[in-house]
Amino acid sequence: MKITISGTGYVGLSNGILIAQNHEVVALDIVQAKVDMLNKKQSPIVDKEIEEYLATKDLNFRATTDKYDAYKNADYVIIATPTDYDPKTNYFNTSSVEAVIRDVTEINPNAVMVIKSTIPVGFTKSIKERLGIDNLIFSPEFLREGKALYDNLHPSRIVIGERSERAERFAALLQEGAIKQNIPTLFTDSTEAEAIKLFANTYLAMRVAYFNELDSYAESLGLNTRQIIEGVCLDPRIGNHYNNPSFGYGGYCLPKDTKQLLANYQSVPNNLISAIVDANRTRKDFIADAILSRKPQVVGIYRLIMKSGSDNFRASSIQGIMKRIKAKGVEVIIYEPVMKEDSFFNSRLERDLATFKQQADVIISNRMAEELKDVADKVYTRDLFGSD
């Protein structure tokens, strides 16, 4: 089969490479530089498995900027374009997804389109009715940035928002490329699948917020956070995972998904969902106040990225801390080797790590790094377990 991937971010590339082990895959992107890299078997994003598979595996994979070449004769088109959250409308910006749907409908109306981008609850049903089309399925992704292909090779589950033969064929494409066997697979309706994605990510955000509030409590009262978390997590119903305190949840998915779900609750009584969003804001206030209490002249931000093994710092929690500190008039310098710019939000980027360490009175790091251990007395982090 010919499978086209529209969008070459984490979601698109990981799905494309997974399927290209067994089928023809054409990746479509509007950025020529990314297409050129992919055709040279180089990854435009930081992801260990994507880089490895592109360089060493026998993949039936190519990239193009030509939508006619990409969509023509495709059996499936996977839509993995960005859907950023718009705070003005309280809604995902689905314009890129809609543009792909219109293009595919014009060029190859027989292709089955599968939306992998995160979308509002009810979007698939609504656009099918609005455009008078039926060949559209939603299938949520559950991957981590920096480990996107790994998570597709070893998926926790596969969810397809349709119960049909074509949905089963698409699930088989994902199962065929995976290393994991006997993957739990759920076939449901499109609107339920959309809700599954948002509620799953909101639960993860809630868990992050819970352990962060536990940590704020312990730090305020001089208690040992690690001992409390270890004791709480001995209960198998809670489990000893996803429990490492941080500066708040961040990244591309959790902040926008929680806010979108909250917007979907406008006509439904709720307390918990809104509390999760508020708790994340409160945590950043708490962290910023703790840093400012040290009365630093210069605060060093060690890495803007959200987690190790990633090159993405969209909506990373440390940016919220940085903005709060700058608002109090404290000078901020940044060490972020993946950035080519000289400044970020009017704060200087220091390229030399030794100079960065020397100039900062306090260094804040969401996760502790080996290269900071020689200045551990300067470092402020809430990382207890060395995990994301």
From Swiss-Prot:
First-tier enzyme category under EC: oxidoreductase
Domain of life: Bacteria
Active site: 253 (nucleophile)
Record has NAD as a keyword: yes
Keyword annotations from UniProtKB, A to Z: NAD, Oxidoreductase, Phosphoprotein
GO biological process entries: lipopolysaccharide biosynthetic process; UDP-glucuronate biosynthetic process
Pathway membership, UniProt: Nucleotide-sugar biosynthesis; UDP-alpha-D-glucuronate biosynthesis; UDP-alpha-D-glucuronate from UDP-alpha-D-glucose: step 1/1; Bacterial outer membrane biogenesis; lipopolysaccharide biosynthesis
Database matches in InterPro entries: 6-PGluconate_DH-like_C_sf, 6PGD_dom2, NAD(P)-bd_dom_sf, UDP-Glc/GDP-Man, UDP-Glc/GDP-Man_DH_C, UDP-Glc/GDP-Man_DH_C_sf, UDP-Glc/GDP-Man_DH_dimer, UDP-Glc/GDP-Man_DH_N
Family: Belongs to the UDP-glucose/GDP-mannose dehydrogenase family.
Record-linked NCBIfam families: NDP-sugDHase, PRK15057.1
Protein name from the UniProt record: UDP-glucose 6-dehydrogenase
Lineage: Bacteria, Pseudomonadati, Pseudomonadota, Gammaproteobacteria, Enterobacterales
